[in-house]
Swiss-Prot record:
Belongs to the Antp homeobox family. Sequence-specific transcription factor which is part of a developmental regulatory system that provides cells with specific positional identities on the anterior-posterior axis. Signal peptide: none annotated. It comes from Heterodontus francisci (Horn shark). PROSITE patterns: ANTENNAPEDIA (PS00032), HOMEOBOX_1 (PS00027), HOMEOBOX_2 (PS50071). The lineage of its organism: Eukaryota, Metazoa, Chordata, Craniata, Vertebrata. This is Homeobox protein Hox-D8.
Amino acid sequence: MSSYFVNPFYSKYKPGEALSPTYYDCRFPQDVTSRHAVVYGPSSGASFQHPAQVQDFYHHGTSALPNTGFQQNPCGITCHGDPSKFYGYDNLQRQQIFTTQQEADLVQYPDCKSSSSNIGEEPEHLNQNSSPTQMFPWMRPQAAPGRRRGRQTYSRFQTLELEKEFLFNPYLTRKRRIEVSHALGLTERQVKIWFQNRRMKWKKENNKDKFPTSRNDDEDEEVKKEQEEPEQETTEKETK
């Protein structure tokens, strides 16, 4: 560290120069700037004395400022106070105390290593008492509302039974829907969607808005057609 940083309040110019450096924001009297530069060395440290205000500023004789941690060079300036206050002396003592205290702790607790290795292991009685939890339908993970569900695939047996049920009655009641879902291993929603899709397919294929509910309806329609045909024949004969 240069001597200028040790004592920045004294001139760095040689004696006899006409100009002296100016100090910015200096709270000390102007006679400090007019003093000659001090040649630092082992011989000059005995005759050097700090001004009263400088000593108050650095050694906190009457100043209330906090400690700035300023350390003087012991080679160039006379040491003031106890040598135990030098830089690094306190740290060495603390380091030695820490090492001795750490060794005492290790001697006092020799089983620290063995106990720390068993932290991740669980006690055996906890594993023995733990039983598999019962899963309820509401505990199962459900798909997110914004996520699209996958396409449901039906087996050949399921499609055959559903087709039979559709031919018998294209509309299912709630009771019948529950019976079909339990018989085929499906949910009520899956059975409902299958019947909706099947009805739309039948309408597209036949171009009709209504479904034949039973065979009696078909027979009634045929009877009506047969009755209308002879009536038309009689009207034609009369016109002639």
